[in-house]
């Protein structure tokens, strides 16, 4: 990764009556614009996210999406949909006076990158996508219902289902929704920690015991659940795949971990079949962007796409 430099410009943008989103710029003010779209939904961005881009070459824009990270109010699901986030990205671009930019997103960030590019293809110079997630029911069931990745980590799964009454475990996402939006804050925080611990375990190529902070877990647990319950506000299983024609002209590199248990290879494969113009690069890695094989592959992907952006 590149040196992590401090932002030269940052602030908050009022994007609705309720929400203010945090934004920052680092790197070269006159460089090639790139926006980093974090995962989750609700994960927020970290300073390390700047490190995928050469700060001498890129004007690096990072935002925290509605309800998470440094954005305000925290863990708020009201007025918080995929299409709200797409509109927010455009508001940031317009505020910063950027004509077109490279869009870089992983996991949920890949969903949002594709949704944004398909809505505003004229504003996208290129796409670098990692850990493809299309927000299809089959993908959320794999993650958070019995019979998916639960078969691989049954001991961790037992902890994940523990907050849910046995007679509700046939619809865990719905059952968790009731807990994560409960009026009792202790109920919310306990459920959020169980949800986040499960996911944190899955994203590591070499899993280790995790103990996430309950309050820090609330945004990702609540917002992921909110989006999953609502199908990401996408119309059907092939909502993104059926609109690839809008972005086939955009230079695109897909980086996918072969052993990714959070966003399995099948979604990257489906995207590459629908979008043969994109280059699919499969890495011997899991899901987490900061694992060394994925870091190297992502930095290389950004370097390789650069000539197409100039």
Swiss-Prot record:
EC number: 3.4.11.5
BP GO annotations: proteolysis
KW Membrane (keyword) present: no
Top-level class of the enzyme under EC nomenclature: hydrolase
InterPro entries, per database record: AB_hydrolase_1 (IPR000073), AB_hydrolase_fold (IPR029058), Peptidase_S33 (IPR002410), Pro_iminopeptidase (IPR005944)
Pfam families assigned to the protein according to its UniProt record, in alphabetical order: Abhydrolase_1 (PF00561)
Matches recorded under Gene3D superfamilies: alpha/beta hydrolase
Role this protein plays: Specifically catalyzes the removal of N-terminal proline residues from peptides.
Protein name: Proline iminopeptidase
């Amino acid at each position: 990764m590149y040196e992590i430099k401090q932002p030269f410009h940052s602030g908050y943008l009022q994007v609705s009556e309720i929400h203010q989103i945090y934004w920052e710029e680092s790197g070269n003010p006159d460089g090639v614009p790139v926006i980093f779209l974090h995962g989750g939904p609700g994960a927020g961005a970290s300073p390390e996210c700047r490190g995928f881009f050469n700060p001498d070459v890129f004007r690096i824009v990072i935002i925290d999406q509605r309800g998470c990270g440094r954005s305000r109010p925290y863990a708020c699901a009201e007025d918080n949909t995929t299409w709200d986030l797409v509109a927010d990205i455009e508001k940031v671009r317009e505020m910063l006076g950027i004509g077109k930019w490279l869009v870089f997103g992983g996991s949920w960030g890949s969903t949002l990158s594709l949704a944004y590019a398909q809505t505003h293809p004229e504003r996208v110079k290129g796409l670098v996508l990692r850990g493809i997630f299309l927000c299809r029911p089959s993908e959320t069931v794999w993650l958070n219902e019995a019979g998916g990745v639960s078969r691989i980590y049954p001991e961790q799964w037992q902890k994940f289902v523990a907050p849910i009454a046995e007679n509700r475990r046939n619809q865990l996402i719905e059952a968790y929704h009731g807990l994560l939006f409960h009026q009792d804050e202790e109920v919310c925080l306990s459920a959020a920690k169980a949800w986040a611990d499960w996911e944190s375990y899955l994203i590591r190529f070499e899993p280790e015991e995790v103990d996430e902070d309950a309050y820090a877990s609330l945004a990702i647990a609540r917002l992921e659940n909110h989006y999953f319950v609502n199908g990401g506000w996408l119309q059907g299983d092939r909502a993104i795949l059926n609109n690839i024609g809008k972005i086939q002209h955009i230079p695109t590199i897909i980086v996918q971990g072969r052993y990714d248990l959070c966003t399995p290879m099948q979604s990257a494969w489906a995207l590459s079949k629908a979008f043969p113009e994109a280059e699919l690069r499969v890495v011997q890695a899991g899901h987490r962007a900061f694992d060394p094989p994925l870091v190297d592959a992502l930095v290389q992907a950004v370097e390789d796409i650069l000539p197409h952006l100039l």
